[in-house]
Amino acid sequence: MSITLSDSAAARVNTFLANRGKGFGLRLGVRTSGCSGMAYVLEFVDEPTPEDIVFEDKGVKVVVDGKSLQFLDGTQLDFVKEGLNEGFKFTNPNVKDECGCGESFHV
C-alpha cells in the first residue's frame, strides 16, 4: 500500500510547510461529499494520531487514516499549473467514476 508524490507536489508541500514554520507532513483523506459520493481532503498535520498510517515519499511525510487508505491506495499526488490556475491533482487508480464538475468521485 502506498501513496506517492510527483516532484512538483513534494516541492510545493515542502514550501508550504517551510512558510508555515511547523508541521509533520501532509494529511490525505476522503469524506462523503458531492454528487458522486466522495471528495479528497488535504491538510497539513502537526502530529499523526496512533491510528494513522505514515508514508514518506521524496522527503514528505504523508499521513492517512486507516479508513481512507482503502480508497487512496496507489494514488499519486501532483501539483499542476494550467493557465492561471494551479493546484494539487490526484491520480487515483481506484476511481470508477467522477462527477461532471470534478469535485467528487466514486470507487
UniProtKB/Swiss-Prot annotation:
GO cellular component term of the entry, any: cytosol
Molecular function via GO: 2 iron, 2 sulfur cluster binding; ferrous iron binding; iron chaperone activity
Lineage top rank: taxon: Bacteria
The entry's keywords: Iron, Metal-binding
Induction info: Repressed by IscR.
InterPro entries membership: Fe-S_cluster_asmbl/transfer, FeS_biogenesis, FeS_cluster_insertion, FeS_cluster_insertion_CS, HesB-like_dom_sf, IscA_proteobacteria
Biological process per Gene Ontology, one example term: iron-sulfur cluster assembly
Cofactor(s) the protein needs: Fe cation
Residues holding Fe cation: 35, 99, 101
Cofactor note: Binds 2 iron ions per dimer. The dimer may bind additional iron ions.
Outcome of substituting residue 101 to S: Loss of iron binding activity
Keyword check for Metal-binding: yes
Disulphide-bonded residues: none
Pfam families xrefs: Fe-S_biosyn
Documented effect of changing residue 35 to S: Decrease of iron binding activity
Similarity-based family: Belongs to the HesB/IscA family.
The protein's role, per its UniProt record: Is able to transfer iron-sulfur clusters to apo-ferredoxin. Multiple cycles of [2Fe2S] cluster formation and transfer are observed, suggesting that IscA acts catalytically. Recruits intracellular free iron so as to provide iron for the assembly of transient iron-sulfur cluster in IscU in the presence of IscS, L-cysteine and the thioredoxin reductase system TrxA/TrxB.
Remaining remarks: 2 iron atoms may bind between dimers.
Subunit structure: Homodimer; may form tetramers and higher multimers.
Protein name from the UniProt record: Iron-binding protein IscA
Organism, scientific name: Escherichia coli (strain K12)
Record lineage: Bacteria, Pseudomonadati, Pseudomonadota, Gammaproteobacteria, Enterobacterales
